[in-house]
From Swiss-Prot:
The lineage of its organism: Bacteria, Pseudomonadati, Pseudomonadota, Gammaproteobacteria, Moraxellales. GO terms for biological process: translation. InterPro entries: Ribosomal_bL9, Ribosomal_bL9/RNase_H1_N, Ribosomal_bL9_bac/chp, Ribosomal_bL9_C, Ribosomal_bL9_C_sf, Ribosomal_bL9_N, Ribosomal_bL9_N_sf. It comes from the Bacteria. The gene is rplI. Binds to the 23S rRNA. This is Large ribosomal subunit protein bL9.
């Protein structure tokens, strides 16, 4: 099944690309979610008429993500947690805890945007945490974990 992408899809393509996908993926996921339209002649013509509008929307989303990244790069978060004598936490600090701490600091961050490549944080100390705001925009936040 051929579809025209209405937004960037990881490992598939970017806005306006005509790609071939399995019929179930296109019919059950991409089209109902508004991420693509079937590549018929009518849809191709309609997409070309809306291309400038869609590219403008994508540019606005990118600009908003860059503005949020500038705010996040200036923020340092301190999280207190129970820890043993050697700095090992009783439990862990995960994406939800970091997102909640950033929200309490006045910034809106979804837990899905927080990237912890090595899993949850289990020790006290300072950590640089990546916040993926857009596929092209990643902010770095310094998170300090101290024991109670």
């Amino acid at each position: 099944m051929d579809v025209i992408l209405l937004q960037r899809i990881k490992n598939l393509g970017k806005l306006g690309d005509k790609v071939s996908v399995k019929a179930g993926y296109g019919r059950n996921f991409l089209i109902p979610q508004g991420k693509a339209v079937a590549a018929t002649e009518a849809n191709t013509a309609a997409f070309e008429a809306r291309r400038a509008e869609l590219e403008k929307q994508e540019a606005e989303v990118l600009a908003a993500a860059q503005a949020r990244a500038e705010q996040l790069n200036e923020v340092n978060i301190v999280i207190t947690a129970k820890a043993g004598d050697e700095g090992k936490l009783f439990g862990s600090i995960g994406t939800r805890d970091i997102a909640d701490a950033l929200t309490n600091a006045g910034l809106t961050v979804d837990r899905a945007e927080v990237r912890l490549p090595n899993g949850a944080l289990r020790h006290t100390g300072e950590f640089n945490i990546a916040i993926q705001l857009h596929h092209d925009v990643v902010a770095e936040v310094l998170v300090t974990i101290v024991s109670e």
